[in-house]
Amino acid sequence: PVIEEFGVLLKIPEAAEFVNSLYKLGRAYNLWPIAISQEIGDMAGARGILNNTSTVFIGKVSPFEADQVADILGLKDSARALIKSLGGERGRYREYFVQVTKENAREGDVIQLWPSKMLYWLLTTDPVERSKLGDTLGAYRGNLTEALRSLAGERQGEVRV
């Protein structure tokens, strides 16, 4: 299961217990529950989840937030430096710090995500781009695939917004 903004659930005792049990059972049944948060503070209250997490992805954060994440996760200074170095180029790629724990050993490094143009348009959070996507979606009568193809430049001689 994917749990978006899991910090909200951690504030409800019964929900927090359920989320923690998903992570404990995940190991036993070879499941891979995913908890997503954009708030560093959510991680501080998620010790049970963190203790049963084998893979962590961290996107670009401020230097202060990088220190918070490193402290909460108990990362070495080398990992802290990698998190502070994260970058990317808008519309092309983003960098993420990924840490994998196997048999009580942790390894981490920086990866780059280079999305296709269609995936970029699907996932963009930029308000201007979201508005353009909405306009293009309207021009294609709600056909998301065709709207994305148009924005990605994969359609010739078609409606352009």
Annotate the PLM regions.
Residues 67-87, 92-105:
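Electropositive, surface-exposed helix/loop patches at the edges of structured domains
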Residues 50, 66-70, 80-84, 134, ...:
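Generic detector of well-ordered alpha-helical segments enriched in charged/polar residues
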Residues 1-82:
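Conserved P-loop NTPase motor cores
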